[in-house]
């Protein structure tokens, strides 16, 4: 039961997302992308116990401007016995104006997989989740569990929070409310950072996810915590950032 709860918690905090500054060696006549590529490394703790690491990698396709975002969790120590395979999630998406549109989502953990394609012209999200068929109606603003992090970052930048979102989670569409909880200053390996705290929660659910976004880093989340009934369960904290 503990290992199942650990896995659910790590997936629930679903990868804080960074949007780093445009690289210094970029062409002067080339406009910066809405979201610049980055690689970030985080610690992962379960009830104050170190269970492994989390790596986030955002790439942009130079040909069409679309993005590929990968989140990988690697267990360490005794937890590696339970989770011998890395947990991997990927989202491919485009950015239209200041909004994210997911195109496909993939996840794998050992023999368990999720594969969802977003057909916006046909108005359906279809695929398979843990061997169950997925067929959901698309609506404007619908996100997957990875692309939502980028959408929230862009909304912070543009002052569009608080806001409700619909998110495809496996074979369901779930409703979440993202709210602002105010400023906070954090000490991190990147230095002391002023952050904005954002909380997300489903109606009637006792679990709350909080993320600390740093405006000076392009609203990169430098910390994420999930709590239940006010008690901390899981946490991710940034260690390094490359861009």
Residue ranges and their predicted role:
Residues 16-17, 225:
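N-terminal processing/targeting junctions
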Residues 1-13:
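Bacterial N-terminal signal peptides that target proteins for export
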Residues 19-28:
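Boundary at the C-terminal end of the N-terminal hydrophobic targeting segment
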Residues 29-120, 157-243:
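Acidic, serine/threonine-rich low-complexity disordered tracts
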Residues 3-4, 37, 144, 148, ...:
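Hydrophobic alpha-helical segments and their boundary regions
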Residues 110-151:
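Hydrophobic, well-structured mid-protein blocks that either form specific transmembrane helices
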Residues 27-32, 144, 150-156:
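N-terminal trafficking/processing presequences and adjacent post-cleavage segments
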């Amino acid at each position: 039961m503990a290992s199942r709860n650990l896995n659910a918690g790590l997936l629930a905090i679903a990868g804080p997302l960074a949007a780093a500054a445009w690289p210094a060696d970029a062409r002067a006549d080339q406009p910066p992308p809405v979201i610049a590529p980055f690689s970030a490394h985080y610690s992962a703790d379960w009830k104050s116990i170190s269970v492994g690491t989390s790596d986030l990698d955002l790439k942009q396709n130079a040909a069409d401007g679309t993005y590929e975002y990968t989140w990988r969790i690697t267990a360490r120590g005794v937890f590696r016995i339970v989770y011998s395979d890395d947990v991997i999630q990927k989202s491919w998406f485009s950015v239209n104006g200041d909004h994210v549109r997911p195109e496909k989502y993939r996840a794998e953990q050992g023999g368990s997989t999720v594969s969802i394609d977003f057909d916006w012209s046909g108005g359906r999200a279809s695929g398979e989740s843990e061997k169950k068929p997925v067929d959901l109606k698309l609506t404007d603003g619908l996100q997957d569990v990875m692309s939502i992090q980028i959408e929230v970052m862009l909304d912070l930048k543009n002052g569009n929070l608080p806001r409700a979102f619909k998110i495809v989670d496996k074979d369901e569409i779930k409703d979440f409310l993202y709210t602002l909880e105010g400023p906070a200053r954090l000490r991190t390996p990147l230095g002391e950072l002023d952050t904005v705290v954002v909380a997300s929660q489903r109606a009637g659910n006792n679990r709350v996810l909080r993320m600390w976004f740093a405006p000076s880093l392009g609203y990169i989340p430098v910390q994420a915590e999930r709590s239940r009934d006010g008690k901390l369960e899981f946490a991710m904290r940034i260690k390094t950032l490359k861009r």
